[in-house]
Amino acid sequence: MLIELNSANHSEVLETDKPLVLEFYSPTCVHCKKTEAGLAENAESDDVVVAKCDITAEPALAEQYDVTALPTLLFIKNGEIKERLVGFTHKLIIAENIKKINSIAP
């Protein structure tokens, strides 16, 4: 499942009982576009929720999560950030981190 995160649905998305991968991106960022391909593949899994947030449309959310470079991927479980990756991230690294946060006890 791939969700476009914004200030209106932010709280609802974070309340998921599944692990969450949150990408902060900009539509003009080349590395963001490369990372999104891997995110889309991993979003097909029922084991995780994948959300992306356009920092040009939602700068307050980017600031709230201390995003200073793009793309930034946050791996969240039970509302807590378990991992932060900055820069282009290959789909296999995304999958490994999803597996890692899925193995963390609730």
Q: Model regions: which residues?
A:
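Short loop/turn elements that flank and shape the SAM/SAH-binding pocket of Class I
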Residues: E12, E58-A60, L92
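The canonical Cys-X-X-Cys-His
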Residues: C29-C32, L73
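N-terminal "domain-start" segment that seeds a small globular fold
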Residues: M1-E12
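Short active-site neighborhood of thiol/selenol oxidoreductases, capturing the structured segment around
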Residues: E15-P27
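Non-catalytic, surface beta->alpha helical segment in thiol-disulfide oxidoreductase systems
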Residues: K77-P106
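Thiol-based oxidoreductase modules, predominantly thioredoxin-like and allied folds used
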Residues: E4-L5, F24, A43, D47-A60
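Typically the conserved alpha-helix immediately C-terminal to a functionally engaged Cys/Sec
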Residues: H31-S45
